[in-house]
């Protein structure tokens, strides 16, 4: 497992401390702290408007924070007394819209940082550096092409080459794949991983796409309303989300409320509108150990439908009515109603269900997670 900057002894490439930014009377960032380690990919993941891009712009030097410190490598680039311009910061940046100049060729776009940024590349070496980075992103043959002739994927690679040409130790990426179609996004995720491993560059990646963040990142920082509400490795955040917001935002989960009661035999049982079950049999419990309200989660993929269900000891069985259904890529999504409650089910079966069908469902209590309700 790769060490991270927020573990003891790890080398840090980026440190953000107490970062604040106001727009008018409102805080966009009320005080943000995090680190990115050397050769680490960290994703800032959150909904639109949560402050992700503002953080990136402050690090790049195109936005001035109201308070806080930013350290890139060993260089203090932002503080109460210091504010270095973008060209004096050892960072590369890829914008969401790529910012490829339409009146320039690919070469002229990519060479720009060498002409204007703070680096040690002699003028006579510019062309070699550009050709090397174009080869790296696999568009060397487009070197003299006008930017207006480029496809979306080629523009993205041009912007990536421009961000890498001066060999930065830190690369900032702001929703770089959001304008590409699904096939290109998948290919570029692979390309970004390849480049990261070849160049040993640290990467701070902003996205609202959970799939991108979890595929690429060593660590993910979950943001909401200008704050980092949770941080951790992708598997940890997916399997054991600690904050109420993360549980709602990450992955797909059925969510239903219940009440914990103690039986005469001393067992703690959860009563819900969907199904009742013993608390000791579930996958994960985070409550105060007493009776009271709880919130329960089960993933759509963990619920089996119809004859494809697997009954047996301890399996929870229930019947409901199909209220919505449809094919979503590689699986069917079926919404099943139980009076005032419902469950969303994902099945790979070729069977299609019609609205109004009565169908049985099965799932194991080991697939349920239970959390205390007050913070939900």
Predicted features along the sequence, with ranges:
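ABC ATPase nucleotide-binding domain
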Residues: 15, 35, 71, 352, ...
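ABC ATPase nucleotide-binding domains
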Residues: 92, 96, 100, 105-248
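The feature captures the beta-strand-to-loop junction immediately N-terminal to the Walker
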Residues: 45-47
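Short, conserved post-Walker A segment of ABC-type ATPase nucleotide-binding domains
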Residues: 42, 53-62
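ABC nucleotide-binding domain signature
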Residues: 43, 60, 83-85, 89-99, ...
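Conserved ABC transporter NBD signature motif
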Residues: 68-79
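Non-catalytic connector elements of ABC transporters
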Residues: 2, 253, 264-376
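A short, flexible loop at the N-terminus of ABC-type nucleotide-binding domains that lies
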Residues: 2-31, 35-38, 61, 80-84, ...
